[in-house]
Amino acid sequence: MARARASGGLTIVNAIGHGRLGGAAGLGLWVESRVREARGLWAGVSLTPRGERRLPPRVLEAAATAACSLGACVEGLEAEVHTGFPPGVGLKGSAALLASLVEAVLRLKGVRAPPWRAALAAARVSRGAGLSVTGALDDHAASLLEAPVITDNRGMAILRLLPRDGCRLTAVIGVPGVENPVENLDPSPFRRHSRLYDAAARLGLAGEWLPAMAVSGVAGALALGVEGLASRLYEAGAAAAGVTGKGPAVFALTERPRGAAEVLETAGYEVVEARFKWCG
């Protein structure tokens, strides 16, 4: 059995709202996949904080397709996935799942590939597996690389690795009891705020990814109608706050995590805290 892990993260630029560019930064929240070859069988389970879930065969087949494009071909897989954070809430869990499966298959077959190539291979198959709307190259790259990224999700290109900043900040994340699976996503509320996402993308490409995250987060909060909560997080000292990804999770980046946690707990959210993964 081979194993590999990939990280969850936060949105820098929401590619659903922008329409082309995306950005993400990895957190110290992990998904670990353990795989073995099982000819003719595509089966697995994902163990999450919200219980055990069956992995759809299409997800395992997509991971195998991506790995085979890098020279690691299998005719079937059994997998056990351990997810250390709630899935389906905008914390890049789907990308971390697929990326970790691809990396695990590469290790199973003894094939070495740079993380950026594994991320690209995973992103190319993610839409067909029902794991993303845009291909989510930003999320897959952030899950495997040790730096924040800006990507062209339509052109499938990593445009920029960003400075590894943010180590004085804690990500305080409010997770509601409901999920927002990809198959139920309505992109139109996000696309109504495309000008804000354009501004976030310009900031990100200039290397100013923390301000970009702030702009994108507020745009997401407007899209989902939680701008009042984002405002309260700023009042509590957040450097950036809003909705991450497709939501419904709400985040604050702050040097005062207790204050942000109290705001989120008062609003009825479960609180998860993490730091950027390059910060140790």
Swiss-Prot record:
GO biological process, one term: chorismate biosynthetic process
Presence of the UniProt keyword Nucleotide-binding in the record: yes
Main localisation: cytoplasm
InterPro entries noted in UniProt: GHMP_kinase_C_dom, GHMP_kinase_N_dom, Ribosomal_Su5_D2-typ_SF, Ribsml_uS5_D2-typ_fold_subgr, SK_arc
GO MF terms held by the record: ATP binding; shikimate kinase activity
The name this protein goes by in its record: Shikimate kinase
Protein family according to the UniProt entry: Belongs to the GHMP kinase family. Archaeal shikimate kinase subfamily.
Record-listed E.C. numbers: 2.7.1.71
Span of the signal peptide: none
Subcellular location: Cytoplasm
UniProt cross-references to Gene3D superfamilies, sorted A to Z: 3.30.230.10
Domain of life from the UniProt record: Archaea
NCBIfam families: Shik_kin_archae (TIGR01920)
